[in-house]
Amino acid sequence: FIFGWAPTVDGDVLPVQPFDPQAPAQSKGIPVMIGTTLHEFTMSTYVPAFRTITKEKAVEFLQKKYGERTDEFLTAFEKAYPGYQPKDLVDVDFVFRPGAVEQAKLKAAQQGAPVYMYMFAWESPVLDGMFRSTHCMDIPFAFNNVVRHASMTGGGAEAQALGEKMSSAWLNFARTGNPNAEGLPEWEPYTAEKGATMIFNNDCQVKYNHDKELLEVVMAFPTRGF
C-alpha cells in the first residue's frame, strides 16, 4: 500500500479486508459508483520531453516494457482511443484503471445492487494543457467547484457545463443510488459482459468495453504501479 499506510481489519470499523478477492456480502445491497481519470499520473506533466514526443519515440519507450507484444498493444490502443496523440501512449493510465475494472466486475458478479463505472477524460487547459486529465481532476467537477478551483480547471464555460452535469449525477447517486441525470446519456450499470462506462468530457458518452483488449495486453505484464 502506498507509503505504508494500510487499512487494518478490526471487526468493528473495518469488518472485512477491503482487498479480499471477493466482494463482501455485507455490502451486496449497496450501490457503487467507481471511476478513474484518463491520464491519472500523466507522465508528460513530469517529463517535459514527453509533451512533444513523437510516435516513434513513444514506441521505443513502450518496447522496453511490452517487447514483442508492442504491436499488439498499439493495435488495441488505437481501437480503445482512436485519433490519439503520441503522448497518450505514455500518459494513459494503467495503474488505477485495471483495479477499478476488477472491482466493478466483482461487484457486478454479486448480482445485488448495481455498480456504475466512469472515466473522466476532460483535459484542463491550465498551463497550456500540462495537467491533461490528471489524478483528482474529476473532484472539482463532482462537487461543482470548477470556478473556485480555476487554477486546476481553468473555470471556463466548458468546465462549468461539465461540472453541472457531473455534480447532478453525483447528487442523484447519493440520493437514490442511480446517477442518471439531465444532460447525460443513459448510464447503464456495469457488467463484465457489456462494460458500460460513462466517459465524462465536453461530449459525454457511454462506451462498452472500449479498452478491454488493451487491458488484456497490459495485464499480461506483472509490473504495475509507479
Regions found by a protein language model. Give the residues of each.
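Tryptophan-rich aromatic "cage" segments
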Residues: 203-226
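Short, solvent-exposed polar/charged micro-motifs at secondary-structure junctions
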Residues: 126-130, 195-197, 208-210
